[in-house]
């Protein structure tokens, strides 16, 4: 039938083969796709992963496997993403800009070369809940989504400076006189080995498993294995880094502290890095408040009497 068909938003491929060459077997085809053209920052070169100058907040269309801009596309596209519910002004593009730069940084690939820290090479074939898709993207970038009251922003686990300091002088003092209460993670939750599932392009794009271990922790605590899926991962080095991040996080971040603050706590969003000076923990007095300043006599009035060291 000579009819012109229309296939909107579809990459269509037609192949004609002789069925006698395959006998009774069904012909299967695999394609290596680059994927979608995304909106990326106007000062960004996706080929070299370089950022030039200061970004003015505008975008340009380009192919990119940067995880941050793949997430931006999913959140703002009106056809298959959340664009009908979230506008461009509702998503913190400036936070994604910093996250995208962190993902593009070159790191050792484990085989003598370098590669971007995090890339996204995934395809979504089924309709899923928006939160599940958002969680997959954020887990790969080691970040979490946060609604700060105005926009959907993102907080990433990466090296950063502290934003505030807390001590006994700026927290709520309970009746027992211990403002900081500590707790620890269970030993069973501190995994020292992880099996990371990822897609191996050198093995027909089949699922492979990368085993990551901390031998010193295994010798000390015994073997404690968990499993994880590396979303959008087609690099063995990236899979290894994902497993190593999980192990180090669970082995090193074992302590949590609970305390109450006043109105100044409203300055924070989840994921902020803070510093705590606990007198009971340190065994010394570590902080206080200035009650008054007299510029004429050049004197300070403190909240308690202190003894200055002789030196």
Residue ranges and their predicted role:
Residues 1-141, 148, 199, 204-206, ...:
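Polar, S/T/G-rich
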Residues 3-6, 11-12, 19-21, 121, ...:
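Surface-exposed, non-catalytic interaction/assembly patches
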Residues 51-54, 118, 174-178, 249-259:
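Short linear interaction motifs
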Residues 64, 126-130, 136-138, 145-148, ...:
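Active-site-proximal structural scaffolding
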Residues 77, 81, 143, 151, ...:
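Short loop/turn segments at secondary-structure transitions that flank enzyme active sites
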Residues 122-126, 147-149, 156-158, 198-200, ...:
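Active-site proximal loops enriched in glycine and acidic residues that flank catalytic Cys/His/Asp
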Residues 150-153, 298-300:
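Hydrophobic residues embedded in beta-strands of well-ordered beta-sheets
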Residues 231, 237-311:
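Autoprocessing Asn-cyclization modules and mimics
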């Amino acid at each position: 039938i000579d009819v012109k068909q229309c296939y909107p938003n579809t990459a269509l491929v037609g192949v004609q083969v002789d069925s006698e060459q395959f006998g009774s077997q069904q012909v299967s085809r695999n394609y290596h796709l680059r994927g979608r053209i995304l909106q990326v920052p106007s000062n960004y070169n996706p080929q070299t992963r370089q950022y030039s100058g200061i970004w003015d907040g505008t975008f340009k269309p380009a192919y990119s496997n940067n995880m941050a801009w793949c997430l931006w596309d999913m959140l703002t596209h009106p056809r298959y993403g959340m664009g009908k519910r979230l506008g461009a002004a509702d998503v913190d593009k400036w936070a994604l800009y910093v996250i995208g730069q962190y993902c593009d940084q070159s790191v050792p690939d484990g085989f003598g070369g370098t590669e971007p820290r995090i890339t996204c090479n995934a395809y979504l074939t089924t309709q899923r809940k928006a939160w599940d898709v958002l969680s997959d993207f954020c887990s790969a970038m080691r970040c979490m989504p946060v609604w700060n009251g105005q926009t959907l922003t993102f907080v990433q686990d990466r090296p950063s400076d502290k934003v505030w300091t807390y001590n006994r002088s700026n927290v709520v003092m309970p009746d027992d006189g211990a403002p900081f209460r500590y707790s620890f993670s269970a030993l069973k939750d501190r995994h020292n080995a992880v099996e990371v599932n990822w897609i191996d392009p050198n093995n027909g794009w089949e699922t492979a498993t990368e085993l990551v271990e901390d031998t010193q922790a295994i010798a000390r605590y015994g073997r404690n294995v968990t499993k994880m899926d590396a979303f959008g991962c087609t690099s063995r080095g990236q899979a290894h880094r994902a497993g190593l991040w999980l192990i180090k996080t669970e082995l090193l971040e074992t302590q949590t502290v609970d305390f109450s603050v006043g109105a100044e706590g409203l300055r924070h969003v989840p994921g902020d890095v803070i510093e705590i000076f606990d007198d009971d923990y340190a065994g010394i007095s570590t902080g206080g408040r200035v009650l008054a300043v007299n510029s004429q006599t050049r004197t300070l009035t403190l909240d308690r009497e202190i003894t200055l060291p002789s030196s």
